């Protein structure tokens, strides 16, 4: 198991949004976090993604909230890889959701590349 660490950035853009910045060896991954917590309609999600993408190169969106799945965001109209995460807000949520990748080189940068390409699968408890 490889755990990638990062920081959650708070972005104030038409309300607040969270973006994870995950560091690899030489690369970084940016994820718009927990879509289910914002109460946004699809057109508003697209609007926020366009706005945030001007600040950070968004690579994926998180379709979980504190480890709980929000399948309503697993739609092709959101044209980003959709990632599951437990988001580690409380001990009860640790390990509830994760991603798995099958990479030849087991490096953080290889994992980041796989996520960008959507070459992973989500796991849930």
Where in the sequence are the language-model features?
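Charged catalytic cores and adjacent phosphate/nucleic-acid-binding surfaces used
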Residues: 1-5, 11-27, 37-125
């Amino acid at each position: 198991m490889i755990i990638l660490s990062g920081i959650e950035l708070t972005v104030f853009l038409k309300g607040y949004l969270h973006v994870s910045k995950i560091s690899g060896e030489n690369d970084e991954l940016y994820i718009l976090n927990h879509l289910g917590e914002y109460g946004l309609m699809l057109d508003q999600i697209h609007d926020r993604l366009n706005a945030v993408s001007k600040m950070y190169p968004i690579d994926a969106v998180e379709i979980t909230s504190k480890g709980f799945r929000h399948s309503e965001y697993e739609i092709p109209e959101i044209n980003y890889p959709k990632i599951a995460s437990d988001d580690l807000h409380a001990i009860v949520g640790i390990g509830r959701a994760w991603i798995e990748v099958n990479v030849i080189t087991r490096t953080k940068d290889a994992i980041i590349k796989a996520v960008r390409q959507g070459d992973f699968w989500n796991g849930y408890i």
